[in-house]
């Protein structure tokens, strides 16, 4: 083989071997080299596409012709690029041997082996740096004939004779001990005894009596016999005394019997037992072993050369050299290519415009679009945007940079700068096109961040995530594997459910609170919680507790840590989160929010009061009698006037009246008072507010309301009305054998006695309301009835005035009732009596035909007008006390004639001996004035009112009068011939206001109008007078 080929062969073998180095070898380093490549690139080039149709009339303007179209087509070109790549080589002090880098000793180890760069390990019997000397201890020199000049049995180097002084002795001859305050090899360390002396060899402190401790920093307590010092060990710098061995275990960075000696260069860790692995001049920290690389190198072992474009400590500096120049990685000095010089390699060796070895060839570049030409070959350097051999061609579209040879080829998310085309790489990538990952131990943007991993193989170039060794987690690999992983590199997945963690060594699951089982797949049983489900729930009213924290899950209506508190008033539901909507003092159930209303209210939200007549929590019916009302909350009865007792069922006791029966009656001569308004009901023959006045002349009877029938100037008995005739006269009036025709007419007491009329008018004017009540009370007291009655009286006697006749009515015309209007009456009979006179136009249409009496006497029937409705339905049953219906009819009879026209079945026809009047229709109010007496008895004049509901309205309960509880007793037959039919009456204006309220739901009826209010529908019935007749029988109902 020729000699020129040998160097090439060795270089090829070296490159081949360099390519086979193992990158995981701790002694393998890397460097960057540049290389050029010729590639075929594609780019778009614009072309003008001419139109296919010719321009037919170009003279009309170019805008009328079809225009060419610009299209882009892909073309290819050859480009030469310079790039850099990372290559492996053995670190400084090492060389490659069979694929591995082994240490290199500059001097061959004669009788030993090279264990580190320039460090030999000699076999026994040999000494020296290269293990070539066999001098005995204490001798040195080539012939081993020179004694060492080292004292205290110190050894010396067998070649140089330099003494190796042990700890505590000063060089060069090891004869003098260390200066006080210093210790160790070559006396290079200061004592750490707080001013106290130390052992020159070990550095152990000699503490005074009052202090103790490894560094004399613990004070002793003084006693009677001196100082008492606590027992301490002698290990310094955090060393731990090992009792079994009786020695100190030193922390990282320290060594020696008491841990007083720092680690020598090249060692680190506990007891300095670990060897440093830093290359290329890097130093390791004696505590952590982390390498501090020399400028120009990086990596955890300082094995990598700084990337191209970076230099300095930890490759943190950026090179500031021309694009084609490289910088020295240690200090950043630029390494210029041929033809350039200067700190940045930007200065041309040739003057501008020339190039070549002698700088005599002129440049051919377009000066306007170029920078210059290369000083060696004359190649033009075009300004960005221009290309061509002479920089006179503009760059095609989508190209940039000098010579238009660059495309934005930024990979892995890199962004291309619009002006220069430089790529701003994404984190973890570097290079012109962001094609390369960050160098080892660097990551992030521009690979500027240093990895901080411990116990790791490498770190991610993107985010610095460490690839850890077995049992260590990601991050800086200083703690166990993260949750969910275990094993080598934490690549085994934990089989633990519900966020449980597993042991980084064994993978055993440690369950989170609330779960148990081999894989933490089972929830805690009900009633248990916490880690291992070992805790039991402490809840009162709950559906269990949270399996993790044990928080009680309260049932609706409960709250508190233990669900032991009921919801506060006004709240309800789960966690008492709902607000009650109960009104009027109602409360809600904490479980479901249902309202519990306060007494007197009802409804879902207690929004409605109890209906009238009801009270209490459930609006139960009131227990109050006689139409009294009760308090809606507690049901207390409020009695109407005239009633008393807890339930208002007891009438006022005799002699009392009014609300709560608190008033005392003021009635005399045996008169009784009305229990509601206190008005006196006088006995026969007495009148006045307090029954203190006797009947005036010409009157008699109850309240002196009946006129005497004894003739002018004659007296009558004030109680019975019997005439007190003068001698020679008898009868009533005091005339004998005089037949007077009967006249049906309205009469007043004035018609028979002027003095009585004047007194009657005065009494009516002053006591209208009282008279009504007195009359009703008197009737009740006289007859023992439960209801007041309407009376139709007969009156004999003739008054001057117009006559009226009641036309005959066939016998079949029976059972009539009236409509609400004024009507006129006529009297008719088969044998009409003498005509009767009625005064004035009041009854002008009524006639009085005479009718002879029959065998049994006169049978006079007053026939109602034709507009009174005919009623043929069967008579109803007995009068219902619960009904207030009033039937308006009119009939009278005092013989065994055809019977009355109107009969409701309450009185048999043969028993009917008196006229009957009742009211029924829509008419809400009716009055009957001046009821005349029947023949043969004293006359009575009275005033009464009747009320009843309108037809078609629901029946209403009649008022319960004060004497309704009395037993009915048969009354002596009055000779007045008056028959009374029960009907609900209103006594006076005051009693109207004292009536109990209507039942709920009934509107006020027409009959609730004030009495004697002459509105449409009011009418008066004229009194009727008839000839004397046999005494009538009365039927009590």
UniProtKB/Swiss-Prot annotation:
Residues 1-20 form the signal peptide. The modification Phosphoserine is found at residues 953, 1029. GO terms for molecular function: signaling receptor activity. Residues 777-1037 are cytoplasmic. The modification Phosphotyrosine is found at residue 925. It is found in: Cell membrane; Cell projection, Lamellipodium. InterPro entries: EGF-like_dom, EGF_PEAR1L-like, EMI_domain, LE_dom, MEGF_diff_regulators. Residues 824-891, 926-1037 are annotated as: Disordered. It comes from the Eukaryota. Phosphorylated in the intracellular domain on tyrosine residues. Phosphorylated on tyrosine residues by SRC. Tyrosine phosphorylation is detected upon platelet aggregation stimulated by collagen, TRAP and thrombin and platelet-platelet contacts but not after platelet activation. Tyrosine phosphorylation enhanced its association with SHC1 and SHC2. Phosphorylated when in the presence of SVEP1. It is a single-pass membrane protein. Belongs to the MEGF family. Required for SVEP1-mediated platelet activation, via its interaction with SVEP1 and subsequent activation of AKT/mTOR signaling. May be involved in the early stages of hematopoiesis. This is Platelet endothelial aggregation receptor 1.
